[in-house]
Amino acid sequence: MSLGSELFRDVAIVFSQEEWQWLAPAQRDLYRDVMLETYSNLVSLGLAVSKPDVISFLEQGKEPWMVERVVSGGLCPVLESRYDTKELFPKQHVYEVESPQWEIMESLTSYGLECSSFQDDWECRNQFDRQQGNPDRHFHQMIIRHEEMPTFDQHASLTFYQKIHTREKPFGYNKCRKDFWQKELLINHQGIYTNEKPYKCKECGKAFKYGSRLIQHENIHSGKKPYECKECGKAFNSGSNFIQHQRVHTGEKPYECKDCEKAFSRSSQLIEHQRTHTGEKPYQCKECGKAFNRISHLKVHYRIHTGEKPYACKECGKTFSHRSQLIQHQTVHTGRKLYECKECGKAFNQGSTLIRHQRIHTGEKPYECKVCGKAFRVSSQLKQHQRIHTGEKPYQCKVCGRAFKRVSHLTVHYRIHTGEKPYECKECGKAFSHCSQLIHHQVIHTEKKPYEYKECEKTLSHDSTTVQPQRMHNRETHVNIINVEKPSISSYPLLIIREFMLASNHMNGSNGESPLA
């Protein structure tokens, strides 16, 4: 057996008929990709590999045990009786071996490996001759499953064919009581139950369960990209990535969601999408326990805890934890905005941002709270809102342990410990930790007192101080003021004012919990 054929047999992933029936369509497609990729890798490495029947089947889109060529003249009576009584699996098929493998079958005949009735029942042998109509071109019939299918080679082990015809399966696995013809098939099957990874990369030490994965991984170190797209010239280091890329040009989306009929070009995209229906979040942060439906989201989230910022701007050196943040920042240097709103002309550097912006014009609010029915334009707003019902506070201060519902609130709070004051007054140079504090300070320079209390017409510089004079006139707890002259500060978002309230409560030693926490 050639080195290539032996390696393919060693690394090929094999499923029995029973296992195949349990696989989902996406998993079957993944199996096809891996098997075809394994064979392509061996060929690209210059190893002589005679194409196995299973590869031919997969290339034609057939199931691994699809009949390649049905015997027209019937079966040997012994095999036919086994087939009719369903002693064998119903989807097992007959394979005929003829020239140029005739020399092999000739040697098998000399060892008495033909149908067992051939030794004593010459009528059975004559029936074979009559089937083919040519006594000089004998065919040897075997009923075998995909996992038992041999690659006929003049140097193949005679014992292997004996085991096929006698249906002997000497390699058993105690965990599932399954038996196999070959030791390699047993090893592959054991990989389903164990985490053993026998194939190790010599460059970086990374280990893999299957040899085909190692071959694909080694292309990363060598820089080899043997799969090139004829449409655009883009090259890939794995056959599966190449196949997925081709769907960009063809528009093919073979993976469809049964719940909403949305289609995808990759099986992994469908699996991730289905979690939006099931609510499954299998990836959990070890630091704070927050769970995600995609591992990429977990990796990005984890940078909050590690402080990692892997994306650096080449222009100014500023670093970011998200790639999208870097792209957005780069527009400061380029001034380029790719996505423009047709309604108002506002431009954005990300398509997703434009989509969210357009909902302002359409009024669309696709994200609805299941508890109270409130709807939101952006999914992140819904997540923040849901914490009102759940009481979840995923963002915790490492210094004092205080927890917050929003990461922006944690960022503002953390300045109490660091002493950071990023907001500076241009008039006097005084610095503040909160933007809202700077806004209130600037009133001193403008000498504006825009808030008037209607009972005594006393004017104040900001509305929080109206509470005290109000209590002089009545016992009501509600603030009753008239905004006489709205300064520019009214344009600042409510969040800034709420941040100031949070800081004020903390600095005043309030024991009550802030509504923001």
From Swiss-Prot:
Gene3D superfamilies: 6.10.140.140, Classic Zinc Finger. SUPFAM superfamilies: beta-beta-alpha zinc fingers, KRAB domain (Kruppel-associated box). GO terms for biological process: regulation of transcription by RNA polymerase II. CDD domains: KRAB_A-box. A zinc finger (C2H2-type) spans 171-193, 199-221, 227-249, 255-277, 283-305, 311-333, 339-361, 367-389, 395-417, 423-445. Residues 6-77 form the KRAB domain. GO terms for cellular component: nucleus. GO terms for molecular function: DNA-binding transcription factor activity, RNA polymerase II-specific; RNA polymerase II transcription regulatory region sequence-specific DNA binding; zinc ion binding. PANTHER family: ZINC FINGER PROTEIN, ZINC FINGER PROTEIN 383-RELATED. This is Zinc finger protein 582. The lineage of its organism: Eukaryota, Metazoa, Chordata, Craniata, Vertebrata.
